[in-house]
């Protein structure tokens, strides 16, 4: 399986989708820094990292755009290639050299990793950039331009003691869910009519699920709100774990059942 993983990574890092998604995410991050600096240039010396990082900056549309587009950023790099492999006949060729289960494991691993790093890199770059410009001290609770993280919020202890660690915790969480969302494309690839559909379905699912949860359950199981570090909705660690574990088990079961199919296309 290692040769398959190596080759899949080779394909992934040569994918146009990877660089398009990375460029889009980074552009949003840079745009947020520029917008904040231009809006508050007269009082810039009083601002701190947690007011300016895209994850906790609620002043501009860049935060909402990034987290709304997160499934697209996750799926663009490599998630649609399983559909492509089926349609081009590449899957038939690779199954001459490895088992179907081995192929699925390799493909899923690379899809997950590429999705995670594509979402995490812009957030990390933005964090490193604002840390070179603004001090790391924490704003007072409910201070102007502060995200207003309270004791009931997730990772509130980190927010109060070290904003960089708070940001890193959410970046890792975002990377985990980005990987899971990208794997949805792999799960549905055999039942869609185009590579575009395979890439867009995780986004559609993400938006619909989050919208329904916001309307019926105060947003406490809205994935979009759960991944956003500004935390406009209060949720617990247990809810995050349930969503992550539940999503992981469903995807693993789906891929396991696909891998058990007879190696005949």
Q: What positions do the PLM features span?
A:
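Aromatic- and glycine-rich beta-strand/loop motifs that create alpha-glucan
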Residues: 1-25
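Alpha-helical transmembrane segments of multi-pass membrane transporters/translocases
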Residues: 15-17, 21-24, 178, 228-265
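Membrane-helix interface segments
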Residues: 16-17, 99-101, 105, 194-199
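Central hydrophobic cores of alpha-helical transmembrane segments
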Residues: 21-26, 196-209
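Secretory targeting signals
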Residues: 27-80, 109-182, 186, 226-246
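Helix-loop-helix units of permease transmembrane domains in multi-pass membrane transporters
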Residues: 81-113
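Juxtamembrane non-transmembrane "cap" segments at the membrane-aqueous interface
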Residues: 134-149, 204-220
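Short cytosolic juxtamembrane segments of multi-pass membrane proteins
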Residues: 193-197, 203-204, 260-265
């Amino acid at each position: 399986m290692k040769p398959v993983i190596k080759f899949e990574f080779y394909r992934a890092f040569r994918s146009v989708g990877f660089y398009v998604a990375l460029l889009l995410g980074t552009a949003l991050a840079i745009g947020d820094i520029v917008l904040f600096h231009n809006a508050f240039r007269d009082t810039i010396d009083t601002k701190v990292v947690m007011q300016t990082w895209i994850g906790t900056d609620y002043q501009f549309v860049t935060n909402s755009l990034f987290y709304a587009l997160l499934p697209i950023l996750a799926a663009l790099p490599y998630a649609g290639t399983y559909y492509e492999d089926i349609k081009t006949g590449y899957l038939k060729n690779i199954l001459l050299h490895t088992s179907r289960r081995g192929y699925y494991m390799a493909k899923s691993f690379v899809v997950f990793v590429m999705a995670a790093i594509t979402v995490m890199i812009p957030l990390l770059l933005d964090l490193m950039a604002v840390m070179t410009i603004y001090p790391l001290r924490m704003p007072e609770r409910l201070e102007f331009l502060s995200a207003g993280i309270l004791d009931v919020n997730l990772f509130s202890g980190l927010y109060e003691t070290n904003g960089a660690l708070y940001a890193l915790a959410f970046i890792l969480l975002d990377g985990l869910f980005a990987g899971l969302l990208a794997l949805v494309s792999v799960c549905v690839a055999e039942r869609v009519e185009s590579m575009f559909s395979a890439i867009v379905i995780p986004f559609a699912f993400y938006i619909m699920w989050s919208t329904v949860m916001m309307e019926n359950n105060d947003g406490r199981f809205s994935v979009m709100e759960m991944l956003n570090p500004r935390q406009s909705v209060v949720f617990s660690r247990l809810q995050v774990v349930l969503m992550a574990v539940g999503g992981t088990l469903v995807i693993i079961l789906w891929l396991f059942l696909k891998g058990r199919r007879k190696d005949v296309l």
